[in-house]
Amino acid sequence: MNPGRPVPPPLAKTISLDTAGSEPSTGVLAAAYGATSPMSGLVPLTVARREPGEDDVEIAIEFCGLCHSDVHATRGEWRQPPYPLVPGHEIVGSVTRVGSAVEDFAVGDRVGVGCMVDSCRECDSCLEGLEQYCERGNVGTYGAADPRHEDAVTQGGYSTAVVVDKRFVLRVPGNLDPAAAAPLLCAGITTYSPLRYFDVEEGDSVGVVGLGGLGHMAVKLAKAMGAEVTVFTTSESKFDAARELGADHVVLSKDADAMEAANRSIDVIIDTVAAPHDLNPYFRTLRLDGALFQLGLPADDMPPVSPGLLIRRRLAYAGSLIGGIEETQEMLDFCAEHGVASDVEIVGAGQLNEAYDRMVAGDVKYRFVLDTATLQEPSERADA
């Protein structure tokens, strides 16, 4: 446990999301866990989901992955969010109701919802299937104003039910374990998208910086694409774990000689580290026309990159943000075909605050997943 984390209020206290800006109260009441302030920790809540419209899919949530961004969001570390806030954007469950205009989903289907639940649907990015880069801003799965529903604040997947527009619902293949599939909707697509953008295939060499929730998925996906994979880590204790995941090589990145030995050996690097670190040694491991994709989002500035390194080898330095809906479905189908899933530890609602502390401490292999069956029943309040 992190002794610096504020002590939350008693978990027996249930708070209803009946404040201005919460979702309309005409639909199902869902039990949930969320934060009521930066200092509250996660506590039981009751959230009122909207009544499904003609394009909506109502989902009984079975599992929801815990993402490190959930910690930042609920604790107000990136910005002051609208409280109460129910996090969770790695949702897997079963369809319970569909709107009259929904044809692709039926009651009982296993489905998923990722990091966004809507976009403008009209800009060039949206029309190209890149909703994550919507020029007007996509609607996040939690903590975002939903302009198509009276600017109601979206509430996430640490709950028993959710209602989502059909365009942002994904089909989860039946041969994927539902708990292990949940993190694919964030960690999976976040690493799959840059690998696909670079057209990684058999014979390519992929470097993965960091071996956490994102890094372990990058290793698995790159191997499934036929690549030779090198893991860069600052910790010798992760060597065996990297090899167990399928890495062909493991390099201790703080060892200058080991990094020099890897010079010009990599085609593309997936950097998952969210703390400031010097990228120049990694650029030196890239071959001509190589690329480094930055996925981690450090809170502080990174050391400067040497332009000469980029120029002399025609290297690219790029970022990447999750993936569009079509590509996310492609990723799920790819994982089902190749037997790829996240390594997960399932937790109950009463373990969520401890799980957050363990995430901050890096004490998880490799993703936590909430079993929503452990959430308490919602309060019987028509106005919640």
Language-model-detected regions and their locations in the chain:
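Short N-terminal strand-loop motif that marks the start
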Residues: 1-92, 156, 160-164, 372-384
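Glycine-rich beta-strand-centered segment in the early N-terminal region that forms part
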Residues: 50-64, 77-127, 132, 155, ...
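Adenosine-nucleotide cofactor-binding segment
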Residues: 202-211, 216, 221-281
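NAD(P)H dinucleotide-binding glycine-rich loop of Rossmann-like/cofactor-binding domains
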Residues: 120-209
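Glycine-rich phosphate-binding loop and adjacent beta-alpha segment
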Residues: 276-349, 372-384
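C-terminal hydrophobic helical "lid"/dimerization subdomain
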Residues: 2-5, 11-28, 236, 325-384
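Conserved beta-strand positions in the Rossmann-like core of class I SAM-dependent methyltransferases
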Residues: 96, 230, 293
